[in-house]
UniProtKB/Swiss-Prot annotation:
Protein name: Glutamate--tRNA ligase
Any matching Pfam family: tRNA-synt_1c_C
Locations listed in the record: Cytoplasm
Gene Ontology cellular component annotations, sorted alphabetically: cytosol
Protein source organism: Metallosphaera sedula (strain ATCC 51363 / DSM 5348 / JCM 9185 / NBRC 15509 / TH2)
Protein EC: 6.1.1.17
Sequence motif: 'HIGH' region, positions: 104-114
Similarity-based family: Belongs to the class-I aminoacyl-tRNA synthetase family. Glutamate--tRNA ligase type 2 subfamily.
Main location: cytoplasm
Catalytic activities: tRNA(Glu) + L-glutamate + ATP = L-glutamyl-tRNA(Glu) + AMP + diphosphate
Leader sequence segment: none
Length: 566
């Protein structure tokens, strides 16, 4: 193996180590080498052997040293900076101003799955310098009953994602618009009032040899009279509905004469905004068709499970002579290891969990856990408008989050269940510890003979030689840390692990909570270095040799953090 090859393997080991918090891995290093020099695949065994050697060498360095060494290879620094950003594919049928919308039902918090439509709709509006509308789809005060607080939850979640909107409205405040269109459709014979039972309608709908369905044959004047009775409260809930006339022979029974408007007893089921002001409420498909037309929506981005709804809404457009927006459908987005069902999430909320419970895939839960908004946006844009279902594991989320946080997050020392030792050193020493390596920012910690030092319980072993990160090499003897040497080379020769440490006189009590959705919540108590004093709730830092964590609260001198990921 030539010196040139050693240099290639070495630089990629450095690159991989700095990318992964000081710990390079052989596999990615070998892949990079083969990408640069494909002819070396013929000597794969030798390359792997050399990679193992170089990875061991690089991993023995401190992150500060690795970062400094990487400066020798500017081409790799550039590669780190300009990691390719995926952009969205162009929209079809763009004729004028693009207008998109996001129409959540405010019956629960946003999660990663339903945030997809919000991010894509907003990004496309921005891409074409168009308009983005927020429409609250809140016309079902009984089955999918809106939650009053959820309107603000959704606004907060969208703002967190850096999504802004040009216009906002609630469907529940547009009842007169739905009534007006319904009246026109009744007048023109496109719809009818059905006062028969649901069972009678289904018997006709599902029969192979369809006879005449009496309500369907009523003239417009009869339907208009029945419509007025519906509005005036002459019918109880379930006793009358407005149906749209569709194809009676449609192979999908759900599309046959579907309900446009129905009566809901809002004395029993008051709407959180409108109260009991209205009794006749539009269904999702009717209200959506009317609003999308009246607000000039040009492109609708929705999950493919809405295919049937698109076909239903087309009947309204065709009858009214409106131009149908371009509909773009995408597959489901499943977050592996988390519950995505809105009903299950709502169940947890009803039994005491908060919407920002870090075990949940809600945007608030991800935010509290230390996932940043750019991570969510990048993942959604990466998946884009794929029609096939996509599964995103938390590892995928962590990988993107790590990539985005790594250049900006502060590295701080934290020891779990700290064990106290007396530091025996010959004179006062200074540790110059990397704070943000990518920016060449450092902090200084001064220690003197006799200072008390906390070590992580997992690093404590009688007689073990360790290197206190960026300070010196010591041997653990009872409750003492006996000084051996100060240089890093000595630590390498002795095979000493580089470990974090916390000076007792500057220490802060820290409680790290691990909230894995598939495990019991775990609390890790320990101590953080003095720099923790500068932190405030919401700050995300990297705990050296642990991973990323977000400051959740600070109370009576104790800092509580939520662990994000390694």
């Amino acid at each position: 193996m030539t010196m040139e090859l050693e240099e290639i393997v070495y630089k990629y080991a450095l690159w991989n180590a700095v990318k992964h918090n000081g710990q390079a891995q052989v596999g990615p290093v070998v892949s990079k080498v083969f990408a640069e020099r494909p002819e070396l695949k013929a000597n794969a065994k030798e390359v792997v052997k050399l990679a193992e050697k170089m990875v061991a060498k690089v991993n023995a360095m401190s992150l500060e040293q690795q970062t400094a060494e990487l400066q020798k290879y500017p081409e790799l620094l550039e590669e780190r900076k300009k990691e390719e950003k995926k952009t969205l594919s162009p929209l079809p049928n763009v004729k004028g101003t693009v207008v998109t919308r996001f129409a959540p039902n405010p019956d629960g918090p946003l999660h990663l799955g339903n945030a997809r439509a919000a991010v894509l709709s907003f990004e496309y509006a921005k891409m074409y310098k168009g308009k983005f509308i927020l429409r609250f789809d809140d016309t079902d005060p009984k089955v999918k009953k809106p939650i009053k607080e959820a309107y603000d939850w959704i606004r907060d979640d969208l703002r967190w994602l850096n999504i802004t909107w040009d216009l906002e409205f609630k469907a529940s405040e547009r009842m007169s618009a739905y009534y007006n269109v319904a009246k026109v459709m009744l007048e023109k014979g496109f719809a009818y009032v059905d006062t028969l039972s649901d069972a009678e309608f289904k018997a006709w709908r599902d029969s192979r040899n369809k006879t005449v369905y009496k309500p369907r044959t009523n003239p417009p004047e009869v339907n208009l009279e029945l419509w007025e009775k519906m509005l005036n409260g002459d019918f109880d809930e379930g006793k009358a509905v407005v149906r749209i006339k569709t194809n009676p022979e449609d192979p999908d029974p759900s599309k046959i004469d579907w309900v446009m408007l129905r009566i809901i007893d809002t004395k029993r089921n008051p709407h959180p905004i409108a109260g009991d002001k209205f009794r006749v409420w539009p269904t999702y498909n009717f209200a959506t068709a009317v609003d999308d037309h009246e607000f000039g929506i040009t492109h609708i981005l929705r999950a493919k499970e809405h295919t049937t709804n698109t076909e239903k809404q087309r009947w309204v457009y065709d009858y009214m002579g409106w131009e149908m927006p371009t509909v773009l459908e995408f597959g489901r987005l499943k977050l592996e290891g988390f519950m995505m069902s809105k009903s299950k999430i709502r169940g947890m909320l009803e039994t005491g969990s908060e919407r920002d419970d870090p075990r949940l895939p809600t945007l608030a839960g991800l935010r509290r856990r230390g996932i940043i908004p750019d991570t969510v946006r990048e993942i959604i844009i990466q998946v884009g408008l794929k029609v096939t279902d996509a599964t995103i594991s938390f590892d995928n989320i962590a990988s993107v989050n790590r990539k985005l946080l790594d250049p900006v997050a502060k590295r701080l020392m934290f020891v779990r269940e700290g064990v106290l030792f007396k530091l025996e050193i010959p004179q006062e020493m200074k540790a110059k510890v990397p704070l943000i390596p990518a920016r060449q920012e450092f902090r200084e910690i001064f220690v003197k003979p006799g200072d008390e030092i906390y070590l992580d319980k997992g690093d404590v072993e009688e007689g073990k030689v360790v290197r206190l990160m960026d300070l010196c090499n010591v041997k653990i003897e009872g409750d003492r840390l006996r000084f051996l040497s100060q240089d890093l080379e000595s630590a390498k020769r002795m095979g000493a692990n580089i470990i974090q440490w916390v000076k007792k006189s500057e220490s802060k009590s820290v409680n790290v909570i691990k909230a894995d959705p598939n495990k019991d919540v775990e609390e890790i108590r320990g101590y953080g270095e003095g720099y923790f004093e500068t932190l405030k709730p919401g700050d995300i830092v990297q705990l050296v040799r642990y991973g990323f964590a977000r400051v959740d609260s600070i109370s009576r001198g104790e800092i509580t953090m939520i662990f994000a990921h390694e």
